[in-house]
Amino acid sequence: MDLSKLYDCAANDPVLGPKLNDYYGLKRMTRATLFEDIQNRIVEMQMNHKPTAKKMMYRIREQYGSLLDHDGGTLAAWPRPHELMKADPYNIRALGPTLRKGQYLTGLAQDIVAGSTDMHWLTTCDPLTAYNTLVKIKGIGPTAAQDLIMMRGRTDAVFPSNKKKNQEKGLRRWIIWSYGEDPDATTEDRFQELTQAVRSTDCGQELA
């Protein structure tokens, strides 16, 4: 992806400007496909110790993914939908994740194979449509959906307001907080003002 326009437009942004300078050139931390990112997001959900979540995910890869020869040993590939759909959630539970997470993983894999969930379409559709579709998938809440939007091979994203008991949730909360304002009291118009530097399509980036 060409982010040169974003670097130009956000150079003077009080939040993004310094970050773009400090982390210039670093690659996005994403996996090969959106399905892989969703698997990882479901497994690490509500887990504070990410190394443990990583080990759990690798056990799932070893159990259900293909084993590839690598440097004298084997490397477990991420399971594809047709491989994961046959898994028993109770067996996934034995690998570390909760039973519910196992049900989320196998259920999504079954939906993909059945054609009711289209990963290619989710990867290429506009961000708001992708967000509204992702939050309907069991195991993916508003925050996870906003995370996953940024893992697609596109330069646009969306951060809709998601208030519960008058408290802003999701990544939008932290975006507003990073600009030094109160997430719970920030209006939609004010949010648009705060993110103006990177919302323009002239910047190669679209945020909402």
Question: What label would you give each PLM region?
Answer:
Residues 1-208:
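HhH-family (HhH-GPD) DNA N-glycosylase catalytic core used in base-excision repair
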